[in-house]
């Protein structure tokens, strides 16, 4: 039995990289895919847009919905979720993949970059999960998946990239909290 057939999936940061790979794998198993990412114009160093990703995913014969979305902004996330529900009818799976990375040490990292990582990684994950909640509650087998590391409090993981590690662990904290909080709705959070 294919557990992903006819599931409606949202993937943040799905225009390239890991997000696109996950989207293609799910699409190959029959899932409809909504891509929420802010890249609608190709970048010279980072190829791929929501539109090129959608074209790759459509080859699997599933519904695909590319939506330009900056997950730092409530109104954009709310609008995107409304579009997904209008187009697909429901949401079964949310994959929080969008992430900002800056591998500077604390002394060198501008606070603007610190804020960006936390706004996207932690706040964006929280916002997308919270906004999808009413729709996930209606699904028969709802899931939220955050692409974040397991907790490892050994100082070596923080030593060189404290701010980035904090931002990614913020995503992991969402898993811990929401898995317990959403348990009453039978929403699996990993």
Task: Name what the model sees in each region.
Residues 15-16:
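Conserved glycine-rich cofactor-binding loop
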Residues 137, 145-184:
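Catalytic loop of short-chain dehydrogenase/reductase
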Residues 48, 68-80, 111:
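The beta1-alpha1 cofactor-binding region of Rossmann-like NAD(H)/NADP(H)-dependent oxidoreductases
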Residues 105-116:
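Substrate-binding pocket helix/loop in short-chain dehydrogenase/reductase
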Residues 129-130, 176:
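A short, exposed helix-loop element centered on a Lys and neighboring polar residues
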Residues 29-52:
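Conserved glycine-rich Rossmann-like NAD(P)H-binding loop of the short-chain dehydrogenase/reductase
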Residues 7, 62-63, 90-91, 136-150, ...:
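Active-site loop of short-chain dehydrogenase/reductase
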């Amino acid at each position: 039995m294919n557990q992903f057939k006819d599931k409606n999936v949202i993937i943040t940061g799905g225009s390239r990289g890991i997000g696109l790979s996950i989207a293609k794998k799910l699409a190959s198993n029959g899932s409809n895919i909504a891509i929420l990412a802010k890249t609608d114009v190709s970048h010279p160093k980072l190829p791929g847009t929501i539109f090129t990703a959608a074209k790759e995913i459509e080859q699997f014969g599933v519904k695909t919905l590319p939506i330009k979305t900056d997950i730092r902004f409530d109104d954009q996330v709310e609008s995107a979720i409304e579009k997904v529900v209008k187009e697909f009818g429901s949401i079964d799976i949310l994959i929080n993949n969008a992430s900002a990375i800056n591998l500077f040490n604390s002394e060198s990292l501008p606070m603007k970059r610190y804020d960006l990582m936390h706004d996207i990684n932690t706040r964006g994950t929280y916002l997308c999960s919270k906004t999808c909640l009413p729709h996930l509650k209606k699904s028969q087998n709802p899931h939220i998946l955050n692409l974040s590391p397991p907790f490892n409090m050994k100082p070596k993981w923080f030593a060189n990239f404290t701010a980035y590690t904090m931002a990614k662990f913020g995503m992991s904290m969402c898993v811990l909290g929401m898995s317990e909080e959403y348990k009453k709705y039978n929403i699996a959070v990993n």
